[in-house]
């Protein structure tokens, strides 16, 4: 099939630089003179009418490029002959004598996705064996036109192009707080299809789909309806993109298993993993996959199965011990494979990180199951690929744009990861690549910045053997994404990526939000002042101010994707506030309001008020940007962090105005535990404390952080439970700390609190409890964990004095005073639960090393 644009005119203008993404495999400039469209130019094609969208898209694109009219279209039934005597193949052979045309003509990727484009004399001719190939040829034609200064000219070229990897795609995390709107997902699909991406995975659909039988799953989180997915799937299909769910079938179920009604299906309450010894899970999975199959009509289905860390720890332990964990996994994978196949899916994908460890799994997996190998380092060689290849399993490699838990993607690192992993995958026979984006810790970063790394992967995935010229790539990307060739765009990207590359913020990218949301006046120590690094922040602020101005100007003139310019400006504003915050925090470490004159006091107050205004403006803009690309579900969680920060500044203003003494903003309760003798096993610890009450109570609240599953009782009354564990998933993070109203359970005289804490992570089972009992007299009695609490392995004792890691921010990071009146728990760091999780994973002999590391983290204020 073909598309021909005729009646072009040869100009006297000379060739301009051609910028294409992905770069074609075979490209030759055959004449320096540019061609231009004339009033008589038209389109002739034998495309099936069902694929007329391809021509419609081209017509819309040339309108954006400045064409005043649509080109007339004539559909014909037979191939149109080129005006010159040479055939298409003859022209190609003449210009690319090194190409083996027999191999080329029978290349499966060429047949399914390849195209030939010739612009010569008075015609542009695109030929392909498939509609998808024609579509890709049109995308290249659009870029050829966009590469010229007027957007209406085209270089005279011969292009032979087809992908070396059949599958080139992305996985988009919509499950961890920032659920993209359908319109935003369509934007991503349309944009990425222009760069010849053909797979789009939605992560994770087991808890982001509105299952009819389980209406509580995904509720309040932006879960997608059948109608939304059906609409999105049809849109993707039209753009030659496969829309595929990543549906976890064993691990990453903690968002669901956090709910009490689903505990029976997991290893334990809040478990990461399903109980594979319970046959009822297969009924649930079968029903859910059936629902998905009604709208996800691709032949591909991704069953996840990565990071299933809890398998064999709880409910399935006896079963797993009996048959061996490798065989247990294999039986489960085969059951899932059979279920998925029964719903019409032909190609099933599974993550590699668990299965590759067990030879019986590698030997026993169905040989058509595709293994997705993911790795986010920058190494050039990946021996595990060779190991998987030995068992003749198809492989897809999956690098990352490395945007998780940071303000701005780590471009330098991700470009190496994408280039090296895809190249090594190609060398080991991979059939494709899927580049991932992750929204760890509530997905605070605006999703629009994912697009650049995704586009980079399209370049590498098309031809992994070709070395990417980064300057030319970014020049091409910015031109085709924003529609103009303006060096200021390049400057914005270069300056923002240099913030990380040159360590201008003096912190690791993954610690940025920890410092951003930490209490600005957290400590009163000279060492703390020393640890707040602000060197050359004045220069960085100046750079960010410059970027903000540039972005404001660019927003007015870019013809496409203006919203992405606004996001880049927001990043600059965010960094600027971060710098101002740290400068102010450092300045006020030694500040004593009682010793300064009124004039200086006013200066300090004005500085804090300026920070408040800056932060408030930042929050307002953040909300606008969020709602322009994502559903409102999930935003309140992050907004609350900004509001806490504003409250901290309000309190500092009040403290300064009143010339009050500095007050430690962290709750005084300590992180306590019994001992470290039960590491690497599930164990239970009981904690108890007796409190005396001699007056009438106005209100009484208890805030509890468990480790990992804590039941709270007061005077033998069950109050509730809290699941506190390390997770990247939204529901767990939202509920790691719980507040309980305990007034009705208290009595005059002695009251006994008992915490039954079960640590399923193999850690040391630490807890932190802070409570306030307000008495009618106006007095407040505090409940706080410390070394006056007792602990035991059994409910009946023997009871021992507990051990303590001290009060926040030690180990947990900062924990400010909760707002009990409004049921808002302490603002916690993303790192709060990491320590106990690490204890459960590292060898027991290294426990003391971890304790030293945590002490150093505290000493150097890495955790605030």
Predicted regions and their residues:
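Aromatic-lined ligand-binding clefts that engage carbohydrates, nucleic acids, or primary amines
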Residues: 691-694, 698-713, 752-757, 799
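Acidic, contiguous N-terminal accessory segments
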Residues: 1-132, 140, 144-163, 350-356, ...
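Beta-strand-rich ligand-recognition modules
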Residues: 711-769
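Short beta-strands within extracellular/lumenal beta-sheet-rich domains
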Residues: 681-692, 735-740
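Feature activates predominantly on carbohydrate-active enzymes
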Residues: 22-29, 42, 103-343, 349, ...
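An acidic-aromatic loop/edge-strand motif
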Residues: 660-678, 746, 752-829
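Substrate-binding groove of N-acetylhexosamine-processing glycoside hydrolases
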Residues: 2-30, 36-37, 45-48, 52-55, ...
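Flexible loop/turn segments at secondary-structure boundaries
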Residues: 51-52, 178-180, 207-211, 250-254, ...
């Amino acid at each position: 099939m073909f598309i021909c644009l005729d009646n072009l005119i040869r100009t006297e203008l000379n060739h301009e630089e051609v910028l294409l993404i992905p770069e074609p495999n075979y490209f030759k400039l055959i004449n320096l003179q540019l061609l231009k469209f004339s009033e008589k130019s038209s389109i002739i094609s034998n495309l099936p009418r069902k694929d007329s969208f391809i021509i419609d898209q081209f017509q819309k694109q040339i309108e954006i490029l400045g064409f005043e009219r649509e080109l007339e279209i004539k559909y014909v039934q037979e191939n149109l002959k080129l005006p010159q005597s040479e055939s298409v193949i003859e022209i190609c052979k003449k210009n690319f004598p090194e190409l083996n045309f027999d191999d080329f003509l029978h290349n499966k990727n060429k047949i399914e996705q390849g195209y030939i484009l010739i612009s010569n004399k008075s015609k542009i001719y695109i030929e392909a064996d498939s509609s998808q190939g024609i579509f890709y040829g049109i995308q290249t034609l659009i870029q050829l036109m966009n590469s010229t200064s007027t957007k209406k000219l085209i270089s005279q070229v011969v292009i032979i192009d087809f992908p070396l990897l059949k599958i080139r795609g992305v996985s988009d995390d919509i499950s961890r707080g920032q659920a993209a709107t359908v319109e935003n997902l369509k934007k991503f699909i349309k944009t990425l299809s222009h760069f010849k991406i053909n797979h789009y995975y939605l992560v994770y659909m087991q808890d982001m789909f509105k299952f009819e039988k389980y209406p509580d799953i995904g509720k309040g989180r932006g879960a997608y309806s059948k109608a939304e997915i059906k609409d999105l799937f049809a849109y993707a299909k039209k753009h030659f993109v496969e829309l595929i769910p990543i549906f976890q079938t064993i691990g990453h179920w903690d968002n669901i298993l956090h709910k009490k009604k689903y505990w029976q299906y997991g290893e334990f309450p809040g478990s990461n993993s399903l109980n594979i010894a319970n046959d009822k899970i297969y009924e649930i999975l079968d029903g859910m996959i059936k629902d998905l199959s009604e709208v996800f009509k691709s032949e591909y289905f991704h069953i996840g199965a990565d990071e299933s860390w809890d398998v064999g720890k709880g409910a399935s332990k006896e079963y797993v011990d009996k048959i061996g964990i490798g065989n247990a996994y294999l039986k489960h994978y085969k059951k899932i494979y059979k279920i998925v196949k029964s719903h019409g899916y032909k190609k099933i994908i599974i993550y590699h990180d668990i299965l590759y460890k067990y030879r019986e799994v590698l030997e026993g997996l169905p040989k058509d199951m595709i293994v997705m190998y993911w790795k986010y380092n920058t190494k050039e060689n990946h021996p595990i690929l060779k190991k998987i290849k030995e068992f003749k399993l198809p492989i897809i490699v999956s690098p990352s744009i490395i945007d998780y838990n940071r303000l701005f993607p780590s471009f330098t690192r991700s470009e190496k990861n994408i280039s090296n992993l895809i190249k090594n995958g190609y060398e080991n026979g991979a059939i494709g690549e899927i580049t991932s984006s992750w929204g760890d810790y509530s997905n605070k970063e605006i999703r629009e910045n994912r697009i650049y790394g995704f586009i980079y992967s399209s370049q590498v995935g098309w031809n992994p053997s070709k070395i990417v010229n980064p300057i030319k790539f970014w020049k091409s990307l910015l031109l085709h994404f924003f529609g103009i060739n303006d060096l200021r765009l390049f400057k914005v990207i270069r300056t923002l990526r240099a913030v990380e590359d040159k360590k201008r913020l003096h912190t690791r990218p993954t610690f940025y939000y920890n410092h951003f949301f930490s209490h600005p006046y957290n400590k009163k120590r000279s060492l703390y002042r020393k640890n707040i690094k602000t060197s050359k922040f004045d220069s960085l602020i100046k750079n960010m101010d410059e970027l903000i101005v540039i972005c404001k100007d660019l927003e007015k003139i870019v013809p496409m994707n203006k919203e992405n310019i606004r996001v880049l400006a927001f990043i600059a504003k965010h960094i600027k506030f971060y710098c101002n915050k740290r400068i102010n925090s450092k300045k006020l470490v030694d500040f004593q309001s009682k010793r300064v004159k009124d004039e200086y006091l006013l200066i300090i107050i004005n500085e804090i008020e300026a920070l408040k205004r800056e932060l408030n403006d930042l929050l307002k803009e953040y909300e606008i940007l969020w709602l322009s690309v994502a559903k409102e579900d999930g935003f309140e969680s992050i907004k609350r962090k900004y509001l806490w920060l504003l409250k901290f500044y309000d309190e500092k203003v009040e403290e300064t105005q009143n010339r009050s003494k500095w007050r430690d903003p962290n709750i005084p309760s300590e992180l306590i535990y019994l001992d470290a003798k039960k590491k690497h096993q599930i164990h239970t610890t009981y904690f108890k404390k007796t409190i005396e009450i001699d007056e009438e109570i106005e209100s009484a609240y208890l805030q509890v952080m468990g480790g990992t599953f804590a039941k709270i009782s007061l005077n033998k009354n069950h109050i509730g439970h809290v699941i506190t564990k390390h997770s990247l998933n939204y529901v767990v993070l939202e509920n790691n700390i719980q507040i309980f109203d305990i007034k009705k359970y208290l009595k005059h005289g002695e009251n006994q609190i008992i915490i039954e804490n079960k640590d399923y992570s193999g850690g040391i089972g630490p807890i932190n409890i802070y409570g306030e009992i307000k008495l009618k007299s106006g007095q407040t009695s505090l409940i706080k964990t410390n070394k006056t609490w007792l602990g035991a392995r059994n409910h009946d004792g023997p009871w021992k004095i507990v051990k303590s890691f001290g009060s926040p921010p030690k180990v947990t990071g900062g924990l400010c005073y909760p707002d009990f009146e409004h049921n808002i728990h302490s603002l916690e760091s993303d790192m709060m639960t990491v320590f106990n999780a690490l204890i459960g994973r590292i060898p027991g002999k290294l426990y003391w090393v971890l304790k030293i590391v945590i002490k150093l983290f505290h000493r150097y204020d890495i955790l605030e």
